[in-house]
Amino acid sequence: MARYTGPTWKISRRLGISLSGTGKELQKRPYPPGQHGPGQRRKLSEYGLQLQEKQKLRHMYGVNERQFRKTFDEAGKMPGKHGENFMILLESRLDNLVYRLGLARTRRQARQLVTHGHILVDGSRVNIPSYRVKPGQTIAVREKSRNLQVIKEAIEVNNFVPDYLTFDPEKLEGTYTRLPERSELPAEINEALIVEFYSR
């Protein structure tokens, strides 16, 4: 399945979450597109709830179905809770951490920065958005890319960096200091439903 590249506001309204991180998609019409009001939302079956939760997480991180399932299966081989490990692996993606550091305003924008070669990991250029960053590794903007307007704008509006990251706004450089705890990952996701979905 290819990655969705259409308007994110439709997906945001359908799933009831903000994919842009701004929440603007849900401010005016916090109900799915095509419906005539908030009271028209259909009650979902158990399978429907599981599928919706899977789609929420998949679209949140901007991952196609094949990558998503591959990461899920990999998480199942790790010690600990399957669902929590799955979310930690997704959170450790390079494009996501570029977004978390505030170098991009959305994950989609962060993915483009990585793909276009603007990002370094431990001093080497990495252009693979799914690259898994390990604790202790450093993420930085290339010297030639430091004046990009999209990065400047993102830095101006970013006022929060998670505790598992450190960031130096002068150097445009951050470090993934440790793996995140569950309490630091998206609270609106019930990963148990995703585990149930793939266990059917």
UniProtKB/Swiss-Prot annotation:
Keyword rRNA-binding: yes
Any single Pfam family the record assigns to this protein: Ribosomal_S4
Single biological process term from Gene Ontology: translation
A single GO cellular-component term on record: small ribosomal subunit
Region (Disordered): 21-42
SMART domains according to UniProt: Ribosomal_S4, S4
Cross-referenced InterPro entries: Ribosomal_uS4 (IPR022801), Ribosomal_uS4_bac-type (IPR005709), Ribosomal_uS4_CS (IPR018079), Ribosomal_uS4_N (IPR001912), S4_RNA-bd (IPR002942), S4_RNA-bd_sf (IPR036986)
Molecular function per GO: rRNA binding; structural constituent of ribosome
Domain S4 RNA-binding: residue ranges: 92-155
Keywords: Ribonucleoprotein, Ribosomal protein, RNA-binding, rRNA-binding
UniProt keyword Ribonucleoprotein present: yes
HAMAP family on file: Ribosomal_uS4_B (MF_01306_B)
Its biological purpose: One of the primary rRNA binding proteins, it binds directly to 16S rRNA where it nucleates assembly of the body of the 30S subunit.
Subunit structure, interactors included: Part of the 30S ribosomal subunit. Contacts protein S5. The interaction surface between S4 and S5 is involved in control of translational fidelity.
Family according to the record: Belongs to the universal ribosomal protein uS4 family.
Alphabetical list of NCBIfam families matching this protein: PRK05327.1, rpsD_bact
Name listed for the protein in its UniProt record: Small ribosomal subunit protein uS4
Classification lineage: Bacteria, Bacillati, Bacillota, Bacilli, Bacillales
Encoding gene (name): rpsD
